[in-house]
């Protein structure tokens, strides 16, 4: 049985003011092609389907179109769970009716994992669906009131209560943070679980962390977000996770390349050098090496980089905190005119003329008079 493992689609995402709807539509078209080319039997979507709990109309329509195409045109089975960005009630709407078409959606944790079984030439494959849950929700399901128990201990207890048949092939789909996963420290405020929670399972399809990777050399994988969703992900590995589930204990995992409409790139250099490059319609963030602020830098950059996400100054950002504190303390003692003069001369890289100083002196004196 051949599976496609997706996660963290974040449909409806706004990337620094740019809607990714067209990019996501383009991605889905390439996924349809991959399904046909690789003869995929089943698609797993491991949470964070939407970017927001209350998605906009465009996002809802795109997800509906995506799922409808997977089931009706690609004729694959689809198993989908909710993530922390999803609204369980909205995503779960009509799920009972959809199951008859081969689309299974699970958005709430229950005492026993939702189990869906399909067959291939080697026998049964059991899929278990574990949507995103909070610690308090899991404690309520288990009937545990211990305030100090870790999430890892809770999940181990929960998994121990499940009725797995380990003589068969078992796949779990979840949305959580598994220690050993890249970027665990970056998921602030969330507790983790250990890979040992999933011992005995043939494949664990996870969502939540956005880098496509394997956890601790076990059959535990994060699909990652197929598209880059922030400048922090500019260097992350992205891909589509394809699993060839053969006989018991025989799993082959391959990462297929993602076809993106636009990539996300971080470019570094002096502004004039960056402006001399060919026009670029990718999503670009610029890190400037200039030691002074450049006039209208963003507007000038957009003439070359049509989808500019923003820019920053590497050397200005690297100012030592002690020096920055001293500068701020000094600035607090300056008059409005002196402060503005300093800003003007830094921005324009030239001394302010006496005529300009007189004009602004008159302006500030007028403002002071109005306030008094």
Describe each PLM feature range:
Residues 8, 28, 48, 63, ...:
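Divalent metal-coordination and catalytic microenvironments
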């Amino acid at each position: 049985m051949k599976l496609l493992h997706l996660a963290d689609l974040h449909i409806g995402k706004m990337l620094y003011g740019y809607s990714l709807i067209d990019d996501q539509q383009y991605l889905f078209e390439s996924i349809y092609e991959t399904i046909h080319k690789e003869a995929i039997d089943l698609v797993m979507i491991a949470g964070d389907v939407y970017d927001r709990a209350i998605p906009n109309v465009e996002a809802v329509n795109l997800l509906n179109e995506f799922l409808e195409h997977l089931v009706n045109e690609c004729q694959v089975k689809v198993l989908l769970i909710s993530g922390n960005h999803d609204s369980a009630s909205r995503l779960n709407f009509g799920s009972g009716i959809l199951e008859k078409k081969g689309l299974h959606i699970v958005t709430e944790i229950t005492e026993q994992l939702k189990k869906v079984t399909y067959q291939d030439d080697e026998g049964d494959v059991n899929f278990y669906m574990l949507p995103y849950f909070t610690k308090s929700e899991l404690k309520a399901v288990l009937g545990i009131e211990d305030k100090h128990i870790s999430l890892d201990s809770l999940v181990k207890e929960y998994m121990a209560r499940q009725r797995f048949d380990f003589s068969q092939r078992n796949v779990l789909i979840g949305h959580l943070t598994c220690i050993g996963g890249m970027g665990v420290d970056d998921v602030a405020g969330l507790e983790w679980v250990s890979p040992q929670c999933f011992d005995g399972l043939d494949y664990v399809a996870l969502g939540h962390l956005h880098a496509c990777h394997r956890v601790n050399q076990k059959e535990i994988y994060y699909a990652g977000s197929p598209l880059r969703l922030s400048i922090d992900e500019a260097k992350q590995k992205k891909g589509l996770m394809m699993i060839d589930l053969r006989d018991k204990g025989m799993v082959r995992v391959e990462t297929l390349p993602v076809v993106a409409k636009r990539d996300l790139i971080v470019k570094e250099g002096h502004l004039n050098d960056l402006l001399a490059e060919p026009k670029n319609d990718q999503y670009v963030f610029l890190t400037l090496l200039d030691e002074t602020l450049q006039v209208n830098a963003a507007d000038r950059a957009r003439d070359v980089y049509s989808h500019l996400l923003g820019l920053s100054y590497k050397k200005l950002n690297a100012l030592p905190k002690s020096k920055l504190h001293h500068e701020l303390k000094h600035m607090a003692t300056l008059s409005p005119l002196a402060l503005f003069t300093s800003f003007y001369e830094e921005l324009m890289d030239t001394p302010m003329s006496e005529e300009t100083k007189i004009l602004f002196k008159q302006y500030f004196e007028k403002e002071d008079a109005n306030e008094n």
